[in-house]
């Protein structure tokens, strides 16, 4: 009987302040389940893509260990393969939005048990030009906060680190004049933020109604936030988003399978 192989792609900087013991517990569960286990750590940005692409065809299961970014990179690497393994996820990042959408436990051992005994499911994968994504592609306000929030702050503060960094953006909000064609519908306007996502949460800052987000329907959710003209407009937008009222205050919310975006 041929022993099945499982590869863990581990981002060691994700959740650095979290105890490492549970990761060893997860690895032990995989070994006890009969898998020949390999562990590869990322050392620089983009490593997860390379590791997944180089090793993915020679394994039965690839498990991404890190935050949403690590998962996204792992998927990007796997999408380059003709024969793709099964994918698992042990969330170790600061926000883990996509894991929450999938109801994956934040405890590594419990998440490993879900991988071993849970139901397999299909997921929509987005393609933006030549890049793949499973979680979100976005532009505008607050998008820089996920990149500029210091790793130490994200490890220590989690969601709060993104919120604090996002608040800095409020002083430098600038709208984007765009022309967007989504499934044949043309949208012209000035927007503060836009996202194409497959998650019930974006960057730990915005929540979408779980009843309106389906992760395997062949469509992503498009959210556009118009540029406010007055402080009152901004307040109304925030309230509409908090209350998930996507048909108010000029908000655009659609389920789309394809789109073309032009900016000025």
Spans of features found by a protein language model:
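ATP/NTP phosphate-donor binding region
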Residues: 1-65
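Nucleotide donor/acceptor-binding cores
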Residues: 3-6, 85, 257
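Catalytic core of DAGKc-family lipid kinases
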Residues: 33, 42, 80-193
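Short Gly/Thr/Asp-enriched flexible loops that form oxyanion-binding sites at enzyme active sites
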Residues: 70-82
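Gly/Ser/Thr-rich active-site loops/lids in small-molecule metabolic enzymes
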Residues: 153-161, 201, 205-230
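A generic structural signal for short beta-strands and their flanking turns/coil linkers
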Residues: 174-176, 190-192, 216-221, 255-259
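ATP/nucleoside-binding phosphotransfer catalytic cores, i.e., glycine-rich phosphate-binding loops
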Residues: 182, 214, 224-264
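Phosphate-binding core of ATP-grasp and ATP-grasp-like enzymes
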Residues: 195-206, 242-245
């Amino acid at each position: 009987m041929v022993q099945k192989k499982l590869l863990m792609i581990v981002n060691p900087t994700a959740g650095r302040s979290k105890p490492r013991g549970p990761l060893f517990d997860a690895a032990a569960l995989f070994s006890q389940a009969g898998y020949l286990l390999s562990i590869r750590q990322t050392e620089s940005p983009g490593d997860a893509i390379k590791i997944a692409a180089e090793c993915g065809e020679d394994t039965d299961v690839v498990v991404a260990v890190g935050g949403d970014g690590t998962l996204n990179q792992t998927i990007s690497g796997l999408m380059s393969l003709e024969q793709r393994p099964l994918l698992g996820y042990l969330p170790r990042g600061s926000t883990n939005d996509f894991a929450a959408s999938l109801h994956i436990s934040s405890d590594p051992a419990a998440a490993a048990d879900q991988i071993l005994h849970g139901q397999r499911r299909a997921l929509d994968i987005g393609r933006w030009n030549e890049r793949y994504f499973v979680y979100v592609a976005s532009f505008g306000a607050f998008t820089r906060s996920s990149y500029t929030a210091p790793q130490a702050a994200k490890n220590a503060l989690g969601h709060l680190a993104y919120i604090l960094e996002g608040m800095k953006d409020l002083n430098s909000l600038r709208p984007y004049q765009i022309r967007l064609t989504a499934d044949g519908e043309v949208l012209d306007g000035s927007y503060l933020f836009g996202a194409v996502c497959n998650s019930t949460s974006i960057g730990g800052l915005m929540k979408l109604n779980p009843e309106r987000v389906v992760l395997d329907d062949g469509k992503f959710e498009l959210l556009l936030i118009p540029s406010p003209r007055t402080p009152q407009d901004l307040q109304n937008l925030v309230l509409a988003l908090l209350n998930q009222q996507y048909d108010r205050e000029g908000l655009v919310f659609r389920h789309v399978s394809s789109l073309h975006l032009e900016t000025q």
